[in-house]
Amino acid sequence: MMADESFDLESLGSDEIFEGVNLDELEQQAQTQVQAQSSQVVVPSEKQKQNLNLPNSYTNSSQKVRESTVNSQASLSSNDLRTELLIKSGENAILRANLLKQSEANNAALESLNNSIKQKQDEYQRKLEELKKEIEYAKTKSLFHEREAQDAIETMKKMKRDVKNSPIMKKSHEEDGDNKLLSSSDQLAKSTKHAAKNSPSKKKRKTSVATAEDASTDSVSSSIAISDASLSLSLMKDLLSLQKREDLYFSSRTLAYVFGGCMHSLETIEGEEEGECLFNNLKALIYSPDLSMDSSNYVQSVVQTSSSILNYSMKKLLYNASFAITSLFNALLILDPKSSTFIFQENVVSLISGFLLKEYEKSNFLDSKFYVLIDFLYLYLSIARESADDFANITKAVDPSLFESCIRVQNAPSLIKCGVCLIISSTTPSFCASVNLLNADDKSQESLMQLFTTMAHILVVTTRERINFPELNEWITLHRFVISFFTVFIQMSGNIGKEILKVCNPLIVCIGLAITWYHQQLLSSMYPQNECVEILVSLVRLLYILSSEDLSSKFMLAENALQPRFVYAIACCAFGDTEQKAFGNLGEEMYFLTTELLEVCVSPEELEQLYTNF
């Protein structure tokens, strides 16, 4: 019975065990009972005195002894109860604490179990949703295949009906009927003239009739085969014609959309008869194309007319018309990359390149309207560099000095960004900015070094000038583009590119100065930490690739005490707790790169001292 009623205390919470019981009230009742027992003293009544019939003196002494005994017993009993009560109170307190801890542990376990159950439910719900999506996809795919099968069946039925209704099939059916009549007459002749069955003349006639039937059957079969082949060929021709017409319509509609946006700018060339004629020709080509042309010939015609308008507008210095027609060329390159061949044949690339360079030299600043011209060259070179055979000739159409002009520090950051993208699009394993890396003369090498120096100065603009915050964000974004260019250049050109960049001392110095500046920004928390870390790591990687044994001397020859500042920044990146925490998963890589750079810049004793200081 006791075994059945036993329970596990650890499985219950404190609230369940003392449900309905007030322990404080029980403890107070026990204390009250002890105090009442200690205050009670046993005194004999008068009736008891009379029954004893003892002398008064004996009675008084006996009473005193009895009272003292009772008092001592009561006092002893009270002390025991107090002690026992204190023990019970302590046990109750310990039990309460243990039960409270057990309850908290049980609640935590229950909460953890609930969280685990919720996670499992979410996971199963997600899997269920994925399965539902897969089922819906399978159903849709099945319906699609079923529809295709039905269409194929209907097409086959239609083709069969067309073949049956063709004149050749009708003729074959008539010939089959004549053959049946001929065979019936032969059977009738057999039944009536059985005697003449084995005559030679009859056998000869039967043989000739059978030969005619076989020839007729073969001719019908070959006619049906020829009819099917001609029908398939006709269908294929119709489909190809429809496809060409659809391509032509698509090109025309796309160009019409672009042309409609720049028509107002192109109307400026209508002042003279030649310009008006060119404008009307282009307008007719786009809005009313000749349906007999295929898409390739149509695009070529549009390119020829557009190049004539571009040449005319640049001669007349009609800038808006030049920008509008260049937008049309951009649309053509996106619509049909093969149009780059037609564009090159019309000398559009050299025309735009020369126009840009002339305007830059004249005004010493490229207006924002010239973005569209740079975008065109960027798109064109990006497409043209896919064909390595023609790229050597294409680079001759773009002057190398144009690339450096587009990234001058005096320009707006957005314009410099377009220029950097233009340089990236001109980079191949053998070429960069219209310079042949494998066979460059002194003038080409000088222009290339000037280009890299100008691009390196972009990295240190923020360290030398006070720039407001919005514009500073544009420069930081521009730094990413510059770092991307040098990374792409090294990846494509390999060891040749590394050796070219290593001898460009301004580039090495600017990278070191940029590292110190970004390290300061990382500690100042003025910019998002992840952006500073990203650019700082990229700069350290780039410097590690381009570093040489004379790296320290290059920094010493620089201005603004770059050598000690650089060593401090690199040492902080290697050994500083704040920097390593900011680098996160890149901490090990940064430690390796920075310690390698420190070994080049300082002596072993100085490196040991730096490590000790940190």
From Swiss-Prot:
Its main location: nucleus. This is DNA repair protein rad26. It comes from Schizosaccharomyces pombe (strain 972 / ATCC 24843) (Fission yeast). It is found in: Nucleus. The gene is rad26. Signal peptide: none annotated. Keywords: Cell cycle, DNA damage, Nucleus. Residues 191-207 have a biased composition (Basic residues). Pfam families: LCD1 (PF09798). One of its GO terms (biological process) is telomere maintenance. Involved in cell cycle arrest when DNA synthesis is inhibited by hydroxyurea, and in mitosis arrest after treatment with DNA-damaging agents. This protein is S phase-specific. Residues 29-43 have a biased composition (Low complexity). One of its GO terms (cellular component) is chromosome, telomeric repeat region. Residues 50-76, 181-190 have a biased composition (Polar residues). Interacts with cds1. Coiled coil: none annotated. Residues 29-76, 157-214 are annotated as: Disordered. The keyword DNA damage applies. InterPro entries: DNA_damage_chkpnt_Lcd1.
